[in-house]
Swiss-Prot record:
This is (-)-germacrene D synthase. The keyword Cell wall biogenesis/degradation does not apply. InterPro entries: Isoprenoid_synthase_dom_sf, Terpene_cyclase-like_1_C, Terpene_cyclase_plant_C1, Terpene_synth_N, Terpene_synth_N_sf, Terpene_synthase-like, Terpene_synthase_metal-bd, Terpenoid_cyclase/PrenylTrfase. Keywords: Lyase, Magnesium, Manganese, Metal-binding. It catalyses: (2E,6E)-farnesyl diphosphate = (-)-germacrene D + diphosphate. GO terms for molecular function: germacrene-D synthase activity; magnesium ion binding. Sesquiterpene synthase involved mainly in the biosynthesis of germacrene D. Produces exclusively the (-)-enantiomer. The Asp-Asp-Xaa-Xaa-Asp/Glu (DDXXD/E) motif is important for the catalytic activity, presumably through binding to Mg(2+). Signal peptide: none annotated. It comes from the Eukaryota. It comes from Matricaria chamomilla var. recutita. Mg(2+) 2 binds at residues 300, 304. The keyword Metal-binding applies. Belongs to the terpene synthase family. Tpsa subfamily.
Length: 549
């Protein structure tokens, strides 16, 4: 048997080991935790009163929008979800599409983000008689930034907003160049905005960028600033505790010994789940999603970077049966993966059943089976040397991107807000999930194309390969096309987040946040597979370095 095993030619990916070691294994609670929690409660009341006062006074409705924007960007909106919803609903009910206050782009962005489908016609006032944006707009840097950010909430056929990114980027880049010498704070802010608009940013990452900028503003609200810093540190402590508990679970796998071929990215898996929801009330859901992310990585590398065709067939059949009676039929290295996968879902199923919501895990399990089945289809293509058509690839890649399965997993443990109808909706391949999966698949395939082509043992044909072969074009042509299609998919995502009534906005935000994380990981290169300084610094900012108060 040993000689036969040695004869097996396996793919070889040579992934680098984890960069974190056991850094997050031990958690120590801050000594001043209770005192900080009391301070936070007092500051929350101050801010809550400010929101109520501004809401009750129509002349202060523009100030109200500014305050809500600051609360959101400082990363403390989760303290005031009810107040923000009440305020924005009042704004929408009062003005409809005919906003009378200032900061029209801010009004547009905040209401669309909240799910109110306000018209983009308000931006007609920004155009001159020739249909071009007024040059006078370029004299107001903050107004240009607001217009730039609003444009990324657009949907298809909103021509005025399609023109806005080019106009604003051009002039903001010039402002950036001109401001370098005298306003480094503003320069950094513009640079960050041009790198990634708010719509594509993870809220917690945005807060890390915005807090230092906000602190430099002379007019900043001291209560807001202090609350944002204390709140950040409180949550960081909670997240570190979660990661410590999760790390103990992960150590049980002994990856270096039992699954040495996989990318050991457990800290990055947790950070990914943190991107979906960082708020304290979703701790249980976040812990479960982290474990699902870990299995998704494990399975991806098993199917793509180690397993041979016959082994993968056996494993896929075992997953379809979902029974420990299949364990003996599996190759030795797959037994641990299979058993732990079933145990994870069974444990969560028991927990949810006690709460009267057994359907949570039932649908998550179906999504996992479908996900693994799509990997098997791709393994078959690779085994047969088959390059599928673009249409064939798209049908399978929608599932193999993992984002449908992960979206459904992200609902598990969120409580009553995730109804059985929500799970049925997600499993039915709705347009909102299709848009997210398209963004994930295309961005991943573009950055991974060249690297994976060099892998020993080959790699399944990606969507880039399929399009190149079918249309006889270069890879650079496909990269440019896919980047355009990603922007189109964002328009689909924006529209569906506005018109989809089957699930509440709080569930839609899980999907939107997961999509934002793709932009964080795969904008220029695959920073999940090849963890570099930028991602390391980002994770340290979230999970290592407390914020100075």
């Amino acid at each position: 048997m040993a000689s036969r095993e040695n004869e097996i030619i396996r793919p070889k990916a040579n992934f680098h080991p984890s960069v974190w070691g056991d850094q997050f294994l031990v958690y120590e609670e801050p000594e001043d935790q209770v005192e900080v929690e009391k301070m936070v409660e007092g500051l929350k009341e101050e801010v809550r009163k400010e929101i109520v006062v501004a809401l009750d006074n129509p002349s202060k409705h523009t100030d109200l929008l500014v305050l809500i924007n600051e609360v959101q960007r400082l990363g403390i909106a989760y303290y005031f979800e009810e107040e923000i919803e009440r305020a924005l609903k009042h704004i929408y009910d009062t003005y409809g599409d005919h906003w009378k206050g200032g900061s029209a782009p801010l009004w547009f962005r905040l209401l669309r983000k909240q799910g109110y489908y306000v018209s983009c016609d308000i931006f007609n006032q920004y155009k001159d008689n020739t249909g071009s944006f007024k040059e006078s707009l370029t004299n107001d840097v903050h107004g240009m930034l607001e217009l730039y950010e609003a444009a990324y909430m657009r949907v298809h056929d909103e021509v005025i907003l399609d023109d806005a990114p080019v106009f604003t980027k051009t002039h903001l880049a010039k402002m950036l160049k001109d401001s370098l010498g005298y306003n480094p704070t503003l320069s950094k802010y513009i640079q960050d905005s041009l790198e990634r608009p708010i719509r594509k940013r993870l809220p917690r990452v945005d807060a890390l960028h915005y807090i230092p900028f906000y602190e430099q503003q002379v007019s900043h609200n001291k209560s807001l600033l202090k609350l944002s810093k204390l709140g950040f540190n409180l949550l960081q402590s909670m997240h570190k505790k979660e990661l410590s508990e999760l790390f103990k679970w992960w150590k049980h796998f002994d990856v270096e010994k039992n699954i040495p071929y996989m990318r050991n990215r457990f800290v990055e898996n947790y950070f990914w789940a943190l991107g979906a929801y960082f708020e304290p009330q979703y701790s249980r859901a976040r812990i479960f999603l982290t474990k699902v992310f870990a299995f998704a990585t494990m399975l991806d590398d098993t199917y793509d970077a180690y397993g041979v065709y016959k082994e993968l067939e056996i494993f896929t059949q075992a997953v379809e049966r979902w029974s420990l009676t299949c364990l003996d039929a599996l190759p030795e290295y797959m037994k641990l993966i299979y058993k732990e996968l079933l145990d994870l879902y069974e444990e969560m199923d028991d927990t949810m059943a006690k709460e009267g919501a057994p359907y949570h895990v039932k649908y998550a399990k179906e999504a996992m089976k479908e996900f693994i089945g799509s990997y098997m289809t791709e393994a078959r293509w690779k085994h047969e040397g088959y390059v599928p058509t673009t249409e064939e690839h798209k049908a399978v890649a929608f599932i193999s991107s993992g984002y449908k399965m992960l979206t459904i997993a992200s609902f598990v443990g969120m409580g009553d807000i995730a109804s059985e109808d929500s799970f049925k909706w997600a499993l039915s391949n709705p347009p909102l999930i299709k848009a997210s999966c398209s963004i994930c698949r295309m961005m991943d395939d573009v950055v991974g194309h060249k690297e994976e082509k060099e892998r020993v043992g080959g790699h399944v044909a990606s969507s880039v390969d399929s399009y190149m072969k079918q249309h006889n074009v270069t890879e650079d042509h496909v990269y440019d096309l896919f980047n355009t299609l990603v922007e189109d998919a964002w328009k689909d995502l924006n529209r569906e987040s506005l018109i989809c009534k089957e699930i509440p906005m709080v569930l839609k935000m899980r999907l939107i946040n997961l999509t934002c994380f793709i932009d964080t990981l795969y904008k220029y290169e695959d920073t999940f597979t090849n963890v570099g300084p930028e991602l390391i610094d980002c994770i340290k900012s979230h999970l290592v370095h407390a914020m100075s108060v």
